[in-house]
Amino acid sequence: MRLKDRIAVVTGVGSGIGRASAVLFAREGAFVALVDRDETGMRETLDAVRHTEGDGSAHQGDVGDGDFAKATIEEVVSRHGRIDVLMTAAGWSCGGTVVTTDPADWDAVFRTHVGGTWLWGRAAIPQMQRQGKGAVITIASQLAIAGGRGNSAYIAAKGAIISLTKTMAVDFATDGIRVNAIAPGAIDTPLLNRSFARHADVEKVRETSRNRHAMKRFGRAEEVAEAALYLASDTSSFTTGAVMVVDGGWLAA
């Protein structure tokens, strides 16, 4: 097991990539502290985690709340004495251009994505420095590299995550802390389906998105979780500041 006896904190576990990654980490032997504002989804993930070789705990709250991030990290460290892996997978999308996006929605998207990366890194990295080792995994998007239509806040936030990831990687490399991003393509998750639902012709938009990938299909959350496992484990010991693209050939096509 690649994460045997490791302690991981994963945000955004109520569904999708966060859930799949948390369950895979547990299956590989980790204790996973689960974080989400959706208590029902988080509890479902906790049940799945507890049916693996690992175990976990549930922490309900807003990832953009710095006090909550600090308190959760302190609780995990108090209980387990360390944090080996931090994965920030919480996210949402409001759609819209820079003209049509409501300022409150813009701020909320950045609070969740960028704040939810910065604040949790800010809380967890000092413990990793004391340990002399740690892995941080952030979630970007292929759209942060390619651009896209009608989703300006989300795409801008994902671009900021890539820049923040690279900055953290350089800042903490000599502390033994690796920081990497995953840039998924369109992954078949509730978040993706909600984004399609904003359009009048949902099936047409789904087909266009599916066919944009060279592989002509959507990705699965479990496929992204495998990339996260690689970055969380010692297998990627010489990898930091990287953006791992898991996009079914979207960017290449």
Language model features with spans:
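Conserved glycine-rich cofactor-binding loop
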Residues: 14-16
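Active-site helix of classical SDR
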Residues: 121, 157, 165
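C-terminal substrate-recognition "lid" of short-chain dehydrogenase/reductases
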Residues: 2, 118, 217-246, 251
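Substrate-binding pocket helix/loop in short-chain dehydrogenase/reductase
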Residues: 97-98, 102-110, 151, 209
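Alpha-helical segment proximal to the catalytic Tyr-Lys
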Residues: 126, 170-174, 237
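Short, small/polar-rich loop/turn modules that mediate ligand/substrate recognition or access, typified
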Residues: 87, 173, 178, 239-241
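Residue(s) in the substrate-gating loop at a strand-loop-helix junction
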Residues: 141
